[in-house]
């Protein structure tokens, strides 16, 4: 396998970006009616829901149930469904596994015997109870419910070393229980080192209203980079060199080998004249994707569980950890169409050995054949996501009242191949989670936990994140926050990712660039290379919440901090039953680690530069 050091990476950055979907050798005439077709036909019936009140329909997706619709403030009110959805996720590992593109991997980890686990589905307002059984041979685990706010349930966030001890291997188990206070599309994944890169991921669909009408819900469509080596080995390699390109890209678990033609293209069935909702999820460890469907536009209706006003695009940048719900109007001639992935930003935001990763969107009645039109190259998004989406549920701030507070600076920098936040690479303690400090009233937190204490009830907190302005080389980062959506008040000027033009936030110039009038709101946003990002969230959800880069190698290398929000309120919110479950799980883990574990902890303990500083309001 080829690995690039930083020097080699820089030398290759100006190579042309990958272009468009093209058939792998020897695939012409192959029967492309894959199991995805059947799965998604059933999804068209299962997903979407009816809201209990029967008002949600193809001609009125804005309605949900009596008293609840697209304009309801879901942070203040949630339907009382009286339902609990129960799931069981069993984690296992397999040796010498034949992958989707025919290449044998010496080890994979699975959820319910699949590298993409079952979809967790519920209606807005349901409780969800998930039993996780860890049958891995030597790894602990914890499962994080990405993007779910966990309002008043921080203890269910699923982050080992923060909200819990890991679940021990060889049969250890844990029951997570939380309420679906939001709706839309997300995913779950392991938060134990880089473990999710070995296959421990799965979609989440919370049925609810939508900002535009559609006929068919196609269900979740996860996309991920795919490596023939294990994530564990890749983490160790990235501690000494730049990351390798992915070996392939999976579309809903399917892929074609770029040279042998082994495997299958994922296929999605469209009905002529119908509008289809597709739930896009980037579950990668490193690759960001530019997506386009030949001869079709996409209308965005949701970004990271935040419903937005319909926004039409011809192509879409999907960063690691991000989700978009889009509507595709099947208004073209009956036929087969390439759904293409390309890599922009001079490959600063990902690369693959498969130069033409693609899936097939097939109209009902079309022949089972490869598409013939490769389409045209989409615009290069330069590793930047959309920042002009308008949320349906509005949040606005007066940006003129923002003042910098340099006393709350949180520098995040690259030191060799170690990422440091506030001068420290986060290194959580599996045996003593931060929540244990909170439960016992111990405020002597470890420096390596990178804790920023945040107080004040329902106050807006502002954070300016600057991307390694003093370093010689900088990369874009998908910044993800647990427990909250954040308002994107501004970012540095759009430039090419390769330019490495330095942009340090200058209040005299950049205050005018800020937008507080219902700006884009989400839980994962791109921090430009050598640039800045200014975000805000409200202190309405007590918890210890990670903010981290969602590139697995970077968070594994330390790029993360914790916002400990309203610690005393957090302590008071935890029930005796949850506290007992927490202690029982930690006792089980400590009986295993480190004395009975065959391997030491060799990274931050999470999935495994930049400055962040708090900005306060003037009074």
Curated annotation (Swiss-Prot):
Binding-site residues, Cu cation 1: 144, 480
Molecular functions per Gene Ontology: copper ion binding; hydroquinone:oxygen oxidoreductase activity; oxidoreductase activity
Keywords from the UniProt entry: Copper, Disulfide bond, Glycoprotein, Lignin degradation, Metal-binding, Oxidoreductase, Repeat, Secreted, Signal
GO annotation (BP), single: lignin catabolic process
Reactions this protein catalyses: 4 hydroquinone + O2 = 4 benzosemiquinone + 2 H2O
GO cellular component, one term: extracellular region
Keyword Signal attached: yes
InterPro entries linked to this entry: Cu-oxidase-like_N (IPR011707), Cu-oxidase_2nd (IPR001117), Cu-oxidase_C (IPR011706), Cu-oxidase_fam (IPR045087), Cu_oxidase_CS (IPR033138), Cu_oxidase_Cu_BS (IPR002355), Cupredoxin (IPR008972)
Chief location bin: secreted
Cofactor(s) the protein needs: Cu cation
Keyword Repeat (UniProt): yes
Binding site for Cu cation 3: 191, 482, 548
Disulphide-bridged cysteine pairs: 55-63, 165-586, 349-383
Enzyme Commission (EC) number: 1.10.3.2
Consequence recorded when altering residue 320 to I: In strain: TS
Effect noted on mutating residue 374 to K: In strain: TS
Cofactor note: Binds 4 Cu cations per monomer.
Extent of the signal sequence: 1-21
Propeptide, chain numbering: 22-49, 607-619
Domain Plastocyanin-like per the UniProt entry, residue ranges: 84-207, 216-373, 431-566
Effect of residue 98 to L: In strain: TS
Family named by the database record: Belongs to the multicopper oxidase family.
PANTHER family assigned to the protein according to its UniProt record, in alphabetical order: LACCASE, MULTI-COPPER OXIDASE
The name this protein goes by in its record: Laccase
């Amino acid at each position: 396998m080829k690995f690039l050091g930083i020097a080699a990476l820089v030398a290759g950055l100006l190579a042309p970006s990958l272009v468009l979907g093209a058939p792998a050798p020897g695939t012409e005439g192959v029967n492309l009616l894959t199991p995805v077709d059947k799965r998604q036909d059933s999804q068209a019936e299962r997903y979407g829901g009816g809201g209990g009140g029967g008002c949600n329909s193809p001609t009125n997706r804005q309605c949900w149930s009596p008293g609840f619709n697209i304009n309801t403030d879901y942070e203040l009110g949630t339907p009382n469904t009286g339902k609990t959805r129960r799931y069981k996720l069993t984690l296992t590992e397999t040796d010498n596994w034949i992958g989707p593109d025919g290449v044998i991997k010496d080890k994979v980890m699975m959820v319910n015997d699949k590298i993409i686990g079952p979809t967790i589905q519920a209606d807005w307002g349901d409780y969800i109870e998930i039993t996780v059984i860890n049958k891995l041979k030597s790894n602990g685990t914890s499962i994080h419910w990405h993007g779910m706010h966990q309002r008043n349930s921080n203890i269910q966030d699923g982050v080992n070393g923060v909200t819990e001890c890991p679940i021990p291997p060889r049969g250890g188990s844990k029951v997570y229980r939380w309420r679906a206070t939001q709706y839309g599309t997300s995913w779950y994944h392991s938060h134990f080192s880089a473990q999710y890169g070995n296959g421990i991921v799965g979609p989440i669909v919370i049925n609810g209203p939508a900002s535009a009408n559609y006929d068919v819900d196609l269900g979740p469509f996860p996309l991920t980079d795919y490596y023939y080596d294990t994530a564990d080995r890749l983490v160790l390699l990235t501690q000494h060199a730049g990351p390798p390109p992915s070996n392939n890209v999976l579309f809903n678990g399917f892929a074609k080998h770029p040279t042998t033609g082994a495997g299958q293209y994922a296929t999605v069935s469209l009905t002529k004249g119908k509008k289809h909702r597709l739930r896009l999820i980037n579950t990668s460890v490193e690759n960001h994707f530019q997506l386009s469907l030949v001869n079709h536009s996409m209308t965005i209706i949701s970004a990271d569980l935040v419903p937005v006003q319909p926004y039409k695009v011809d192509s879409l940048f999907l960063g690691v950890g991000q989700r978009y719900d889009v509507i595709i109007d099947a208004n073209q001639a009956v036929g087969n169409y390439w759904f293409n992935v390309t890599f922009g930003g001079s490959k600063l935001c990902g690369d693959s050995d498969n130069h033409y990763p693609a899936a097939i969107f097939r109209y009902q009645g079309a022949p089972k054949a490869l598409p013939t039109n490769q389409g045209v190259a989409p615009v290069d998004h330069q590793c930047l996501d959309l920042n002009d989406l308008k949320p349906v549920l509005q949040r606005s701030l007066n940006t003129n009242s923002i003042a910098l507070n340099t006393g709350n600076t949180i520098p995040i920098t690259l030191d060799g191949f170690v990422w440091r936040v506030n001068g420290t690479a986060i290194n959580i303690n599996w045996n003593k989670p931060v929540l244990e400090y909170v439960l016992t009233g111990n405020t002597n937190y470890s420096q390596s936990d990178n804790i920023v204490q945040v107080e004040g009830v329902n106050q807006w907190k502002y954070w300016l994140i600057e991307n390694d302005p003093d370093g010689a080389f900088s990369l874009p980062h998908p910044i993800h926050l647990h427990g909250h959506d954040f308002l994107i008040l501004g970012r540095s000027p759009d430039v090419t990712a390769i330019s490495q033009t330095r942009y340090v936030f200058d209040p005299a110039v950049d205050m005018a660039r800020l937008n507080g009038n219902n700006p884009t709101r989400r839980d994962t946003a791109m921090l430009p290379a050598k640039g800045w990002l200014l975000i805000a969230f409200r202190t309405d959800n007590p918890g210890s919440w990670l903010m981290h880069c969602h590139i697995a190698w970077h968070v594994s290398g330390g790029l993360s901090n914790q916002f400990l929000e309203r610690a005393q309120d957090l302590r008071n919110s935890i029930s005796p039953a949850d506290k007992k479950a927490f202690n029982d799980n930690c006792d089980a883990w400590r009986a295993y680690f480190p004395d009975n574990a065959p391997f030491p902890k060799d990274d931050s303990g999470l999935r495994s530069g930049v400055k962040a500083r708090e900005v306060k309001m003037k009074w």
